[in-house]
Swiss-Prot record:
Its cofactor is heme b. Keywords: Electron transport, Heme, Iron, Membrane, Metal-binding, Mitochondrion, Mitochondrion inner membrane, Respiratory chain, Transmembrane, Transmembrane helix, Transport, Ubiquinone. One of its GO terms (molecular function) is metal ion binding. It is a multi-pass membrane protein. InterPro entries: Cyt_b/b6_C, Cyt_b/b6_C_sf, Cyt_b/b6_N, Cytb/b6-like_sf, Cytochrome_b, Cytochrome_b_C_euk/bac, Cytochrome_b_N_euk/bac, Di-haem_cyt_TM. It is found in: Mitochondrion inner membrane. It holds the Pfam family Cytochrome_B. The chain crosses the membrane at residues 33-53, 77-98, 113-133, 178-198, 226-246, 288-308, 320-340, 347-367. The cytochrome bc1 complex contains 11 subunits: 3 respiratory subunits (MT-CYB, CYC1 and UQCRFS1), 2 core proteins (UQCRC1 and UQCRC2) and 6 low-molecular weight proteins (UQCRH/QCR6, UQCRB/QCR7, UQCRQ/QCR8, UQCR10/QCR9, UQCR11/QCR10 and a cleavage product of UQCRFS1). This cytochrome bc1 complex then forms a dimer. Its main location: mitochondrion. The gene is MT-CYB. The keyword Transit peptide does not apply. This is Cytochrome b. Heme b b562 binds at residues 83, 182.
Length: 379
C-alpha cells in the first residue's frame, strides 16, 4: 500500500515541497533564510490578527486603542512588541536572503528572482502602512511625507495623492484604508510566496558552488528540516531576547506622542529598514528625481540577471566580485546611517557619494568585474 503522504492529493503536494524534495547536498546555512521568512510571516499574521481584535482604525481612538492593548489586554504588550519587532526581524531575514541570492548567483533563476522582487515591494508596502496605524507623531508625519512623494508624478500627481488620502490630508479615511490594506496584504504575500516556491521547485535550489547538482541530491527531510529547525531555534532565541529586553530599541520615541497635524517633529524618518532607500531619495535635490531614484534603488535588483557577465555563476571563486559585493554591503550600511541623520553637511555629501556608489557597483562595476574575471580564467 502506498504511504498516505504519497497518495493523498493534498499531502502529495506537501510531500513534494517539503519532505521528498531533492535538495543539493552542499547548501549552507545561508539557504535557511527562506524557511525563516516563512516563519516570520506566520508570526506576523498570528500576532497581527490578535492586535486587530483590539485595535480601532479611527483617528480619535487609534492611539488610545494601542495604549489599551499594552495596558489592559492580557499579554497585549507582548503581542504588540512581537509584531513591531517581528517586522524588523522580517526585514533582516529578507535582506540576508537577497544578499545570498546576489552572492551565489541565484538571480539566474529569473522567474523566482522576479517574484522575489514583487514580494519585497509587497512587504515594504505592508510595513509602511503598518507603521501608520499606531497614529503617533512619526506615523502621521511619515505617512504625510512618503505619500506626498507621489505628487511629484507629472500631471496626475496631486490627484493621485488626494485619491490615496481620501481627502486633502492624511486623516480618518487614510487610516481606515491603510488598516484594511495592512490586514489583507500579508495574505497576498503568503500566496505570492507559494508562487515563489513553485518557480523554485521547477528548477531546484542553487548551491554555493553555482554548478548543477543533479548528480548529488539528498531528500529535504530529515536533512534540511533539522538544519532549518536549528535556524528557527537560534532565530527565536535572539528574537525573544530582543522583544523582552530591548522592545523599544528600534522604534522612534516620537511615536509615543499622539499624532498632531499642527506640530512637526524635528527629524521625520521611516523605520531603520527603509533608511537606505530614504537616504537615496534625499540625496537628489529634485523631488521627481528623488522619487525615481527611490523606486530604482529596489527595481535595480531586476537587472541582476541581465548584467551577469561572468562565466561562473557563484561569486565563491571570483575575488574581484567578492570585493565589490562587500563594498556594496558596506555602502548600504552607510546609506542606512545617513538616512537617520539630519539633512546638513557633511551628511548631504556622504549620502550623495554613497548613492552614486550604490548604483555604480550594481550597474557598472560588477559587470566589468565579471568580464575581467573571465579574462583571468583564460590565462
Amino acid at each position: 500500500m502506498t504511504i498516505i503522504r504519497k497518495s493523498h492529493p493534498l499531502m502529495k503536494m506537501v510531500n513534494h515541497a517539503f519532505i521528498d524534495l531533492p535538495a543539493p547536498s552542499n547548501i549552507s546555512s545561508w539557504w535557511n533564510f527562506g524557511s525563516l521568512l516563512g516563519l516570520c510571516l506566520i508570526i506576523q499574521i498570528a500576532s497581527g490578527l490578535f492586535l486587530a481584535m483590539h485595535y480601532t482604525s479611527d483617528t480619535t481612538s487609534a492611539f488610545s486603542s494601542v495604549a489599551h492593548i499594552c495596558r489592559d489586554v492580557n499579554y497585549g504588550w507582548l503581542i504588540r512588541y512581537i509584531h513591531a519587532n517581528g517586522a524588523s526581524l522580517f526585514f533582516i531575514c529578507l535582506y540576508l536572503h537577497i544578499g545570498r541570492g546576489i552572492y551565489y548567483g541565484s538571480y539566474l533563476y529569473k522567474e523566482t528572482w522576479n517574484i522575489g522582487i514583487v514580494l519585497l515591494f509587497l512587504t515594504m508596502a505592508t510595513a509602511f502602512m503598518g507603521y501608520v496605524l499606531p497614529w503617533g507623531q512619526m506615523s502621521f508625519w511619515g505617512a504625510t511625507v512618503i505619500t506626498n512623494l507621489l505628487s511629484a508624478i507629472p500631471y496626475v500627481g496631486t490627484s493621485l495623492v488626494e485619491w490615496i488620502w481620501g481627502g486633502f490630508s492624511v486623516d480618518k479615511a487614510t487610516l481606515t484604508r491603510f488598516f484594511a490594506f495592512h490586514f489583507i496584504l500579508p495574505f497576498i504575500i503568503a500566496a505570492t510566496a507559494m508562487v515563489h516556491l513553485l518557480f523554485l521547485h521547477e528548477t531546484g535550489s542553487n548551491n554555493p558552488l553555482g554548478i548543477p547538482s543533479n548528480s548529488d541530491k539528498i531528500p529535504f527531510h530529515p536533512y534540511y528540516t533539522f538544519k532549518d529547525l536549528l535556524g528557527v531555534i537560534i532565530l527565536l532565541s535572539l528574537f525573544l531576547t530582543f522583544v523582552l529586553f530591548f522592545p523599544d530599541l528600534l522604534g522612534d520615541p516620537d511615536n509615543y506622542s499622539q499624532a498632531n497635524p499642527l506640530n512637526t517633529p524635528p527629524h521625520i524618518k521611516p523605520e531603520w529598514y527603509f533608511l537606505f532607500a530614504y537616504a537615496i531619495l534625499r540625496s537628489i535635490p529634485n523631488k521627481l528625481g528623488g522619487v525615481i531614484a527611490l523606486v530604482l534603488s529596489i527595481l535595480v535588483l531586476a537587472l541582476f540577471p541581465l548584467l551577469h557577465t561572468a562565466n561562473q555563476r557563484s561569486m565563491m571563486f571570483r575575488p574581484i566580485s567578492q570585493l565589490l559585493f562587500w563594498t556594496l554591503i558596506s555602502d548600504l550600511m552607510i546609506l542606512t546611517w545617513i538616512g537617520g541623520q539630519p539633512v546638513e553637511p557633511p551628511f548631504i555629501i556622504i549620502g550623495q557619494i554613497a548613492s552614486i556608489l550604490y548604483f555604480s557597483i550594481i550597474l557598472l562595476l560588477l559587470p566589468i568585474a565579471g568580464l575581467i574575471e573571465n579574462k583571468i580564467l583564460k590565462w
